[in-house]
Protein backbone atom coordinates (compact mmCIF):
# COMPACT_ATOMS: atom_id res chain seq x y z
CA UNK A 1 0.00 0.00 0.00
CA UNK A 2 1.41 3.29 -1.14
CA UNK A 3 0.49 6.12 1.30
CA UNK A 4 1.05 9.84 1.39
CA UNK A 5 -0.12 12.51 3.79
CA UNK A 6 -2.19 15.37 2.40
CA UNK A 7 -1.99 18.67 4.29
CA UNK A 8 -4.32 21.44 3.11
CA UNK A 9 -3.30 24.81 4.55
CA UNK A 10 -4.60 28.34 4.64
CA UNK A 11 -2.77 30.97 6.69
CA UNK A 12 -1.32 28.46 9.15
CA UNK A 13 2.28 29.64 8.93
CA UNK A 14 2.64 29.49 12.72
CA UNK A 15 1.91 25.76 12.92
CA UNK A 16 2.62 24.37 9.45
CA UNK A 17 6.38 23.79 9.85
CA UNK A 18 5.86 21.80 13.04
CA UNK A 19 3.10 19.71 11.45
CA UNK A 20 5.30 18.89 8.44
CA UNK A 21 8.26 17.96 10.64
CA UNK A 22 6.10 15.72 12.84
CA UNK A 23 4.48 14.14 9.79
CA UNK A 24 7.87 13.29 8.28
CA UNK A 25 8.64 11.16 11.35
CA UNK A 26 5.77 8.79 10.47
CA UNK A 27 5.21 9.20 6.71
CA UNK A 28 7.84 9.76 4.03
CA UNK A 29 5.66 11.45 1.42
CA UNK A 30 3.63 14.62 1.85
CA UNK A 31 1.44 16.67 -0.48
CA UNK A 32 0.79 20.19 0.85
CA UNK A 33 -1.88 22.35 -0.77
CA UNK A 34 -1.43 26.06 -0.10
CA UNK A 35 -4.98 27.37 -0.46
CA UNK A 36 -4.13 30.98 -1.32
CA UNK A 37 -2.46 31.83 1.99
CA UNK A 38 -1.55 35.47 2.56
CA UNK A 39 0.64 34.97 5.65
CA UNK A 40 4.13 33.42 5.75
CA UNK A 41 2.93 29.96 4.64
CA UNK A 42 4.84 30.12 1.32
CA UNK A 43 8.01 31.06 3.20
CA UNK A 44 7.58 28.12 5.59
CA UNK A 45 7.02 25.77 2.64
CA UNK A 46 10.18 27.17 1.04
CA UNK A 47 12.24 25.88 3.97
CA UNK A 48 11.27 22.35 2.90
CA UNK A 49 12.04 22.86 -0.82
CA UNK A 50 15.11 20.60 -0.68
CA UNK A 51 12.99 17.64 0.46
CA UNK A 52 12.00 15.73 -2.68
CA UNK A 53 9.32 13.82 -0.74
CA UNK A 54 7.27 16.96 -0.21
CA UNK A 55 5.12 18.13 -3.11
CA UNK A 56 3.59 21.59 -2.86
CA UNK A 57 0.56 22.72 -4.83
CA UNK A 58 -0.19 26.45 -4.56
CA UNK A 59 -2.65 28.86 -6.09
CA UNK A 60 -3.13 32.58 -5.42
CA UNK A 61 -6.75 32.82 -4.22
CA UNK A 62 -8.38 31.00 -1.31
CA UNK A 63 -10.91 28.49 -2.63
CA UNK A 64 -11.76 26.61 0.56
CA UNK A 65 -10.72 23.41 2.25
CA UNK A 66 -12.89 21.19 0.05
CA UNK A 67 -11.21 22.49 -3.09
CA UNK A 68 -7.78 22.08 -1.51
CA UNK A 69 -8.56 18.49 -0.55
CA UNK A 70 -9.86 17.62 -4.03
CA UNK A 71 -6.80 19.15 -5.69
CA UNK A 72 -4.47 17.43 -3.22
CA UNK A 73 -6.09 14.03 -3.73
CA UNK A 74 -5.82 14.50 -7.49
CA UNK A 75 -2.11 15.35 -7.15
CA UNK A 76 -1.55 12.33 -4.89
CA UNK A 77 -3.08 10.06 -7.53
CA UNK A 78 -0.95 11.67 -10.25
CA UNK A 79 2.11 10.91 -8.12
CA UNK A 80 1.08 7.25 -7.89
CA UNK A 81 -0.20 7.07 -4.33
CA UNK A 82 -2.97 4.59 -3.60
CA UNK A 83 -3.99 6.09 -0.25
CA UNK A 84 -3.90 9.51 1.36
CA UNK A 85 -4.21 10.46 5.01
CA UNK A 86 -5.33 14.04 5.56
CA UNK A 87 -3.93 16.11 8.41
CA UNK A 88 -4.95 19.70 9.12
CA UNK A 89 -2.12 22.21 9.34
CA UNK A 90 -3.45 24.01 12.41
CA UNK A 91 -2.41 21.28 14.84
CA UNK A 92 -5.85 19.86 15.64
CA UNK A 93 -4.84 16.48 14.18
CA UNK A 94 -1.89 14.51 15.50
CA UNK A 95 0.49 13.30 12.77
CA UNK A 96 1.67 10.63 15.21
CA UNK A 97 -1.73 8.91 14.69
CA UNK A 98 -1.10 8.37 10.97
CA UNK A 99 0.29 4.82 11.43
CA UNK A 100 -2.94 3.83 13.24
CA UNK A 101 -5.02 4.99 10.29
CA UNK A 102 -2.70 3.27 7.82
CA UNK A 103 -2.97 0.02 9.76
CA UNK A 104 -6.78 0.18 9.69
CA UNK A 105 -6.70 0.69 5.92
CA UNK A 106 -4.29 -2.22 5.47
CA UNK A 107 -6.51 -4.52 7.56
CA UNK A 108 -9.68 -3.70 5.63
CA UNK A 109 -10.88 -6.40 3.27
CA UNK A 110 -12.10 -3.90 0.70
CA UNK A 111 -10.61 -2.49 -2.48
CA UNK A 112 -11.73 1.03 -1.50
CA UNK A 113 -11.42 2.21 2.06
CA UNK A 114 -12.31 5.34 3.99
CA UNK A 115 -10.90 5.40 7.51
CA UNK A 116 -11.95 8.29 9.74
CA UNK A 117 -10.09 9.09 12.92
CA UNK A 118 -11.64 11.19 15.65
CA UNK A 119 -10.55 11.96 19.17
CA UNK A 120 -14.19 12.49 20.18
CA UNK A 121 -15.99 9.34 19.05
CA UNK A 122 -16.03 7.97 22.60
CA UNK A 123 -17.28 11.20 24.11
CA UNK A 124 -20.22 11.11 26.49
CA UNK A 125 -23.48 10.95 24.61
CA UNK A 126 -21.95 9.47 21.46
CA UNK A 127 -23.21 6.07 20.31
CA UNK A 128 -20.71 3.23 20.78
CA UNK A 129 -20.59 2.65 17.01
CA UNK A 130 -20.94 5.45 14.53
Predicted stretch roles:
Residues 2-4:
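Cell-envelope/extracellular polymer assembly enzymes that use nucleotide-activated donors
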Residues 9, 33-35, 59:
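Conserved sequence signature across two-component system core domains
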Residues 10-26:
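Short, well-formed alpha-helical segments that are part of the catalytic scaffolds
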Residues 14-18, 39-48, 96:
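Acidic helix N-cap motif at the loop->helix transition within catalytic regions
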Residues 23, 72, 90:
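Residue-level signature of catalytic and energy-coupling elements of molecular machines
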Residues 34-43, 91:
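A conserved acidic beta->alpha catalytic loop
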Residues 59-78, 83, 95-130:
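Acceptor/aglycone-binding surface of glycosyltransferases and processive sugar-polymer synthases
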Amino acid sequence: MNFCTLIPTYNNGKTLGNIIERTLTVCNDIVVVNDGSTDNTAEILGTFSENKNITVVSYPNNKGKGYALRLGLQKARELGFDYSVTVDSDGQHFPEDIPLLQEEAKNANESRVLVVGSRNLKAEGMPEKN
